[in-house]
Amino acid sequence: MLSAANIVPLRLAKQAGVRKVIAHSHNASAPGIVRKLMDGVNRPRMKHYVNEKFACSEKAGRWLFGDKAFERGEVTLVANAIETDKYGFSESNRRKIREKLGISGDALVVGHVGRFQVQKNHEAILRIFHEIQRKEPAARLCLIGDGELKEQIQEQAKKAGVLDKIIFTGVCQDVERYLSAMDVFLFPSLFEGLPFTLLEAQA
């Protein structure tokens, strides 16, 4: 589960006699007022249905299960893991992806990987890139992903006069190749647990 809003499966599992009912926190906040209210109501009730509590980070654990549960040692941290060899830097991938995207070898490439939704804060990415563009006119922004706010972000980029400097790749199955083509990775999310994307970018 990602938040206390998903309490129904936990209750049903307990009612069905499941001996091990596990809750896992993979985030550190919840989007929207309704979701926040549901979390506030359900979080105290969750302890009646759960045997084991897991979280991908301390912040995520404290957010879903509370400080007291964390301090009592009731929360087990299981950090997200990636194949570091797969995401390591590749000069070959850097060259090929830049050629594919029509980016020169010496241009500064700023990148981001994430769904176009409020949580990922693409508006901040645009503001930052706009400032970078003023100092580095040849800079390019590579945005990997899709989502309901994509057209809105494209419109904002157009108004800011940087749309022609941005590459929208859509969803990619070979993200690791694109990461090698980037010089700077932006990740200004409003909230996260321990995002795989950030781990991959640092590999």
What positions do the PLM features span?
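Nucleotide-activated donor-binding/catalytic signature segment of Leloir-type glycosyltransferases, i.e.
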Residues: Q154-G170
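Short glycine/serine-rich donor-binding loops of glycosyltransferases
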Residues: L10, P195-L198
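A short, active-site helix/loop in glycosyltransferases that binds the activated sugar's phosphate group
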Residues: V50-G88
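Short His-centered aromatic/hydrophobic patch
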Residues: M1-N6, S25
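Aromatic "clamp/platform" in nucleotide-sugar-dependent glycosyltransferases that forms part
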Residues: V171, L190
